């Protein structure tokens, strides 16, 4: 998508906005992690020049920010402020939780952009691709948690983007509460995502 955006006409630039948002979120998360770790020099600002020119704020300004307060002030006019202002940075914060909130914002913007630029069957197909991608990421997370991390059901549920799920609620609950990876695969074998099992 980044390569397409490089050569896209101005009339289509909004459609590729989600690529920029993804880049900006990654940079913001990197900055938050470096501030929490108090390792200013661990922040890496390395993206293609043509992407840097299209960002919604001057990303170079992130380099010299040395506190959470300064970061919030710097991003106060951006779409990310409404998420970041709700976080208490005076205490150690959950990096995963912050990333989930920003990722939700990312998906919201993709949906809005698709609905703005496309109608009818094209819009339906694009949304279907997006929702399927999110569902597969959810399923992949559940499987990994069951296979490697043995997380609690509440922890697993909080890591998923269920607002975009089209799996029946009962099926999703059964996947989350599965006793292990084998049960997850068994449940998937009876769903529309049976192809996802591959050679597991």
Locations of regions flagged by a protein language model:
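Extended alpha-helical surfaces
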Residues: 1-200
